[in-house]
């Protein structure tokens, strides 16, 4: 957790549920702009290991730790997983300690630490972001995190992000938590989803001739629902799965008088989805390239959740 300038015995307070939140409520009202918003409580090393394993951190990753404390997450990512990265913290003593720890670990060529507000930190280059922040800070950060490149991995110790449900979460024993008193730790993991809400259109060859398709999608974080229109017939999406930029779904609709199952899998690239389409039915068995284009975006998709806009009648396939 990021440090606060006020020195308080947080370890005792944090042993009980709500202790961290209670301390934050004391600190925030009197804090000047730019002062730290969360207290410093180190993440136990065994939790650090599980966080990095859950995010599958590797040599190609660039990790940013928000509220980096003594630097242990960034240093472990570099030393054990070959990653690069940096940590941010407001307390100059923590920055000094982090640099000393990085030097001792022999990873100063791959890590750095910066004294600055985490809300002023450029996160755009990160492939992995780690954090041990309080719930209200996570919620305040959430819109910025959703702006990151699809596929960016986020790992939080103990606190979630409200109604943005984690892709993975679990509870583990942490014997070194609370200054050695021990306790349980929660780990939450998300993959930043691509934005797919809107109306998508494409054509696919069916029975030797191109057939128009239209897809209307609604999105709440990584959860996607919607309907497909195929040659004037409609079907509800099934098995929709969005993980980062990887998007897949299926539906069954009548084509040429017989039901045909459609299975799509592709990668979202802005206003395009590029992948493959597989069709299977009594009269049709085919697989082809799939290239969908977004015809209509929602009025605003910055906040998520978002609903698909309706097409004008001139844009709808008949």
Where on the chain are the PLM-derived regions?
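S-adenosyl-L-methionine
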Residues: 25-61, 92-125
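Glycine-rich SAM-binding Motif I of class I
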Residues: 71-75
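Conserved SAM-binding motif I beta-strand of class I
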Residues: 84-89
